[in-house]
Every structure is written in C-alpha cells, then in structure tokens.
Amino acid sequence: MKMESSKMLVVFTLMVLIAVSSDLVSGNFASGEASSQLCFNPCTPQLGNNECNTICMNKKYKEGSCVGFGIPPTSKYCCCKT
C-alpha cells in the first residue's frame, strides 16, 4: 500500500511539472507578438543585438534582436522573428 501511494505521488508530481514546464518551454515572453517571435537568453554586454541576430540567423530565423520586457522595460531578451 505504501509503495502504491509513493508511486502515485511521484507520477502526480511529474505530471504537474510537465504541465507547468510546457507553458514555460515555448519561450514566448512578449504577449503582443507571441506567435511571431521566440525569445530566450537574456541580453548582456557580451550578447547584444548583433550577436543575437547572428544566433537567430544561424537557427534559420528571419532576424533577431534584444527586446525589452516589463513596464518600464527592465530586462532584455534575445528574440528571433519567424
């Protein structure tokens, strides 16, 4: 009985993690353009617009740039346009 309840708890926990992570994995952070761009790595002094664009072009996207998020924009992420 104890083994069955432990298995059920593990399965339930994994199902919750999968459901939550599937929403996060999509990578779309911009609500207005969620279907037209994919955002991932935070932009830094080393990862700027040029580097972001290069990464996106290498992944066969049309273009890429650092996009600010928040009001006011407090963080920037590298976003590839589809």
From Swiss-Prot:
Ranges that cross the membrane: none
Domain of life assignment: Eukaryota
Major location (coarse): secreted
Coiled coil region boundaries: none
Gene Ontology terms: biological process: defense response to fungus; killing of cells of another organism
Record's subcellular location: Secreted
Signal peptide: 1-27
Keyword annotations of the record: Antimicrobial, Disulfide bond, Fungicide, Plant defense, Secreted, Signal
Pfam families: Defensin (PF24552)
GO cellular component: extracellular region
Disulfide pattern: C39-C80, C43-C66, C52-C78, C56-C79
InterPro entries, per database record: Defensin-like_dom
Similarity comment: Belongs to the DEFL family.
Name under which the protein is recorded: Putative defensin-like protein 70
Organism: Arabidopsis thaliana (Mouse-ear cress)
Gene that encodes it: LCR83
